[in-house]
Design a protein with these regions (language model features):
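Helix-loop interface residues and adjacent transmembrane-helix termini in multi-pass membrane transporters
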Residues: 33, 42-45, 79-82, 157-158, ...
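Hydrophobic transmembrane alpha-helices of multi-pass small-molecule transporters
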Residues: 60, 175-180, 205-209, 281-284, ...
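Short alpha-helical transmembrane segments in multi-pass integral membrane proteins
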Residues: 1-18, 76-141, 185-241, 297-363, ...
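Short runs within selected transmembrane alpha-helices of multi-pass transporters and secretion channels
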Residues: 69, 137-156, 164-172, 193-206, ...
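Transmembrane helix-bundle signature of multi-pass secondary active exporters and lipid flippases
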Residues: 21-74, 138-145, 234-299, 320-327, ...
């Protein structure tokens, strides 16, 4: 069912919307973790390092695609909040057209150049072939991955955060079965893990679209809704492209970090891969809050209810404190989780993984700020600064690694993300409060 976030308690609306999104994010991480666990346990340390070494490259490309998809969802939330259902149907149709175009434009060059990208990232020779086998399949399935994110974004834009969860849970179990079959039985190696992932996401996307068009009359499109118009395309891409570029720019900085990790050899790569999985697991509440706040701000902006936006953001700030404390606790206690990903891990792997996790545990609050304020600004049609914040992230990582890698070694890896989060979080907080101050002045006479 739809959820109108322009009425009722802001805190209650945000939390109720967030719970299914959080469960969905956890399940998405879950089947990503299953890939990693099965690869590590059945294919060994080199295969685990190979899959892990592709993470930043995947984030660069899939982050761009999914950033555009999220932008489509924001525009849907604006139309839904304004109760303009004719425009809403056109945005749904336009989302499907643009998804097909963007997927095609991304798939061809990335599949062709995947090996060259991995070489540029200094991927160790002993895992290069395994990494390329994995990433080529992932890139070939961009359409399936992006389609699920578009369908989920549309449903969340009208306040339905439960339906994407149900189909994602189903596809998660499918992913586990396919992982075991393709890796253990068919013996496709790292490529088998990639096939399992994209097939599972494709099933989830298909079921989402079928349900969406059958269940919600306001989303049922007709032939007259499918056309490319300059105004509609501009509106969709003016939000989607900054969100996409933000993901990709951030990913470039992360790729530089991965390149620094790769210098230390496959054991450190495996340790960093496992530690990154713990980090991702511990921070799942943060993108969840970001998704909820983007929809909340988008609907209330469309409805012209600015006071609700201010109130919701205050509640979001306090939520950040609680979720950052929980994330820190998981990181500090992450040694047990690290053991899930590597068969018979050496003490060296544990040591490198925990060094990283203990360091980042002190900086979880700035990371939570990034998700809260970046998504709020995107939901408010202020996409430029969130995109520039990605540039700040990239530059910070480059500077930290360039200055500290030679004299301090692995400390460069440990410090790059925390320092980046601190500077980026402050930038986004300042930008949001400038917008709020201007908005309060502009709408001071409004009851909303």
């Amino acid at each position: 069912m739809t959820k109108d976030m322009t009425m009722g308690s802001p805190l209650r609306m945000i939390l109720l919307f967030s719970v299914p999104v959080l469960l969905g994010n956890i399940f998405q991480q879950f089947y990503n973790m299953v890939d990693t666990i099965i690869v590590g346990q059945y294919l060994g340390e080199d295969a685990l390092a190979a899959v892990g070494s592709t993470g930043c490259l995947m984030f660069l490309v899939l982050g761009f695609a999914n950033g555009i998809a999220q932008g489509f969802g924001v525009m849907v939330s604006h139309a839904f909040g304004a109760k303009d259902f004719k425009l809403l149907k056109h945005y749904v149709a336009l989302s499907l057209i643009l998804t097909a175009i963007v997927s095609l434009l991304l798939t061809i060059p990335t599949v062709a150049a995947s090996r060259q990208f991995l070489i540029l990232m200094k991927t160790p020779d002993n895992i290069l072939g395994l990494a390329d086998s994995y990433i080529k399949v992932i890139f070939a399935g961009i359409l399936l991955t992006m389609s699920y994110n578009v369908a989920a974004g549309i449903l969340r834009g009208i306040g339905d955060s439960k339906t994407p969860l149900y189909f994602l849970i189903l596809s998660s179990f499918l992913n586990i079965v396919l992982d075991l079959f393709l890796i253990v039985v068919v013996k496709l190696g790292t490529a088998g893990a990639a096939y399992a992932t994209i097939i599972a996401q494709g099933v989830s996307a298909l079921l989402c679209f079928i349900y969406m068009f059958r269940k919600f009359d306001i989303l049922k499109t007709s032939r007259e809704d499918y056309y490319l118009d300059g105004y509609g395309v501009f509106n969709m891409l003016s939000i989607g492209i900054p969100m996409a570029l933000n993901y990709s720019i951030t990913a470039i900085g992360t790729m530089i970090l991965q390149g620094a990790v790769n210098i230390f050899g496959s054991s450190v790569v495996a340790a960093f891969t496992a530690a990154s999985k713990v980090e991702n697991l511990s921070t799942q509440t943060m993108p969840t809050l970001g998704t909820a706040i983007a929809t909340y701000c988008g609907q209330n902006l469309g409805a012209g209810k600015y006071k609700r936006i201010y109130e919701g953001m205050r509640k979001g700030f306090f939520i950040c404190i609680f979720i950052s404390l929980a994330a820190s606790a998981i990181c500090v206690g992450g040694r047990f989780i690290v053991s899930w990903f590597v068969s018979n891990p050496s003490e060296e792997i544990f040591d490198y993984a925990m060094q990283y996790l203990n360091t980042i545990s002190f900086f979880m609050l700035p990371l939570a700020w990034i998700f809260l304020y970046r998504n709020a600004l995107q939901g408010l049609n202020r996409g430029l600064v969130p995109m520039l914040s990605g540039v700040v992230e990239m530059v910070c990582r480059i500077i930290v690694i360039a200055v500290t890698l030679n004299p301090f070694g692995y400390w460069a890896v440990r410090l790059a993300s925390p320092i980046t989060w601190l500077f980026t979080g402050i930038l986004l907080i300042v930008t949001y409060f400038i917008w709020e101050k201007q908005s309060r002045k502009k709408h001071s006479g409004s009851s909303d």
